[in-house]
């Protein structure tokens, strides 16, 4: 059987992102999203869950955007003079203290569990989990909170060796120049048996998103493709089961 998890990263970043998640669930193939717990609209998770009962919510561990949930004094090697995370991953973490990374990851996990929705998995913004200073704390916290995780080509071997549950295949090519309907249909046509995650970033683009994310215009295109009638029909015709990370728990 082919089990497909289409996950929307960046839930909570803006209202337009959250609105895009709802749209792609109700009228498209999205069944999973991951929450940026340090962002202003993360608290909309329960409200969205009521609109989208089968939507899975993961944690999008964020270490290079916005402010930490920990007090700046506790994670001073992660922040700039204004108290924001240092920008420019991966080099932004070059001088980071691994214990401080662990502290902040756990704060974000605790925030996620306080939002009133069942947490299905954990992944990370800009694949920060693959950084040599992050991966061990990421694995430790996933074990502690019994969470399946996304695995990328850079960290899959270590994640599997650690005994964490993860998908069989992770597809990250539906992004930027790869945001085309024919590309998504090609990806769907090449799905292997087992579990596959396709990473996505759908949204309604508003001024807030334009001001904080360089990746914004393509989010509108993603939203339209993920709700395209040809894509929906392909899923039906090929017996692909849409699901979320709860299938791994």
UniProtKB/Swiss-Prot annotation:
Designated name of the protein: Carbohydrate deacetylase
Sequence similarity: Belongs to the YdjC deacetylase family.
Amino acids binding Mg(2+): 60, 125
Subunit structure as annotated in this protein's UniProt entry: Homodimer.
Molecular function GO terms recorded: deacetylase activity; hydrolase activity, acting on carbon-nitrogen (but not peptide) bonds, in linear amides; metal ion binding
Enzyme Commission no: 3.5.1.-
Function (record text): Probably catalyzes the deacetylation of acetylated carbohydrates an important step in the degradation of oligosaccharides.
Transcription found in the keyword field: no
UniProt cross-references to HAMAP family, sorted A to Z: COD
UniProt KW keywords: Carbohydrate metabolism, Hydrolase, Magnesium, Metal-binding
Biological processes, Gene Ontology terms: polysaccharide catabolic process
Classification via InterPro entries: COD_ChbG_bac, Glyco_hydro/deAcase_b/a-brl, YdjC-like
Species classification: Bacteria, Bacillati, Bacillota, Clostridia, Thermoanaerobacterales
Cofactor(s) essential for the protein: Mg(2+)
Top-level taxonomic group: Bacteria
